[in-house]
Amino acid sequence: MGLKEYLFGFKGENMAAKYLVSQGFEILEKNFHSKFGEIDIIAKKDDVLHFVEVKSTSKDYETIYRVTQNKIYKIIKTINFYMLKYDFDLNYQIDIICIEQNKVKFIQNVSF
């Protein structure tokens, strides 16, 4: 990944975090890494943890299709690691934020 792509993704993740804060979420972590994968944003609202995958594009297509079943599998393994590491006993869900042409689309509680 080149610098241009990295900065574009960074901008999208910041836009997503600002959106979540405006909706009453508390941001706990950004870019949490484990040997299993990465979670872009970990947030909390109403005693529920939200593990958020952020996808951005400047093109005219649905970014949701870039979240594959394999990506969700890696996210789930990373969630399990996170929950054990920090000894959380809260409900959680996986959310996706799509940034398409500077517009935020928030898709909550996804499953495959």
UniProtKB/Swiss-Prot annotation:
Q: Which InterPro entries match?
A: Restrct_endonuc-II-like, tRNA_endonuc-like_dom_sf, UPF0102_YraN-like
SUPFAM superfamilies in alphabetical order:
Restriction endonuclease-like
Picking any one GO molecular function of the record gives:
nucleic acid binding
State the Gene3D superfamilies in the record: 3.40.1350.10
Identify its protein family. Belongs to the UPF0102 family.
Write the protein's name. UPF0102 protein CFF8240_0294
The taxonomy runs: Bacteria, Pseudomonadati, Campylobacterota, Epsilonproteobacteria, Campylobacterales
